[in-house]
A protein has these predicted regions:
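Small-aliphatic-rich amphipathic alpha-helix that forms the alpha element of a beta-alpha
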Residues: 56-57, 122, 128, 139-184
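Short coil/turn connectors at secondary-structure junctions
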Residues: 117-120, 167, 190-194
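Glycine/small-residue-rich phosphate/adenosyl-binding loop
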Residues: 2-3, 66-150
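Glycine-rich phosphate/pyrophosphate-binding beta-alpha loops
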Residues: 57-64
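Short acidic N-proximal helix/loop "leader" segments that mark the beginning
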Residues: 1-54
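C-terminal helix-cap and adjacent tail motif
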Residues: 1-22, 194-234
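Glycine-rich, charged/polar anion/phosphate-binding loops
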Residues: 55-57, 105-110, 182-185, 205
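A glycine-rich helix N-cap at a beta->alpha junction
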Residues: 91-99, 185-210
Length: 234
């Protein structure tokens, strides 16, 4: 069954919250998060990883069914086994696409290094066990989308919590291209469908500065014009 108890958290009176700007600490966490692909060899304490996962559990979810499932991988043996299986699949697919063999070899090696070089992996899975079911394919497809959106929001919570804890992370979409292979390789519980994977650890570098489209390029105000031009995040 899904969780029915309440996670303890401080309550803020809306009347005492500054409407102009978010809390400075939260803003710093959001703006300083980067997708980091190189980590120090030191393994984060398992207690810290568990706190990140607790933050994931606070994410909103469709119907509050909490369809997320997480697999924590910390041993090199398991990481290498997964990286090898996924790399072999990548090589077969790229070869079938008639891509350059040298490019394929380099991409496979890069993928193996990223997966095995991360101290901790968190595989994000979705389960439909407690989601609604429908007779028609259209609504069933939409219901699956609701579940995957829920998992993605939980994953974002993990990445922000990692940043706030002095860790870095990177979202890898590769498991989406071979979910059955990942299920088999890791012997996952039945119905756990891989959706993505987070690498987590202490950063070896600051990551690349992100480039984002300006607000006016991605937002349409239907009711009124914006009050002021937002501050640049660069």
């Amino acid at each position: 069954m899904y969780r029915t108890d309440t996670l303890e958290r401080p309550w803020q009176d809306p009347a005492n919250v500054d409407e102009a700007l978010p809390d400075a600490r939260f803003t710093d966490v959001v703006l300083n998060r980067r997708s980091v692909r190189r980590y120090l060899p030191e393994q984060p304490p398992l207690a810290t990883i568990n706190k990140l996962l607790e933050m994931a559990l606070t994410a909103p979810s469709a119907h509050n069914r909490q369809p997320w499932r997480f697999v924590v991988i910390r041993s090199y043996q398991e990481k290498a086994k997964l990286a090898k299986a996924m790399g072999d699949k990548l090589e077969r697919d790229r070869t079938a696409d008639n891509d350059d063999p040298v490019d394929i070899k380099n991409d496979v090696a890069r993928s193996f290094a990223r997966i095995t070089g991360a101290p901790t992996l968190i595989l994000l899975c979705v389960t439909m066990a407690e989601m609604d079911s429908y007779r028609d394919a259209d609504r069933s497809r939409h219901e699956f989308c609701l579940a995957t959106q829920s998992v993605a929001m939980a994953g974002q919570n993990i990445m922000l919590a990692a940043q706030a804890s002095g860790l870095s992370s990177c979202w890898m979409c590769a498991p989406m291209f071979c979910p059955t292979l990942v299920q088999t390789t890791l012997n996952l519980p039945e119905g756990w469908i891989p959706q993505g994977m987070l690498t987590v650890g202490y950063p070896a570098n600051a990551g690349k500065p992100f480039v984002r489209k300006p607000l006016e390029e991605v937002v349409v105000y239907l009711d009124e014009a914006p009050v002021a031009t937002p501050q640049s995040f660069s």
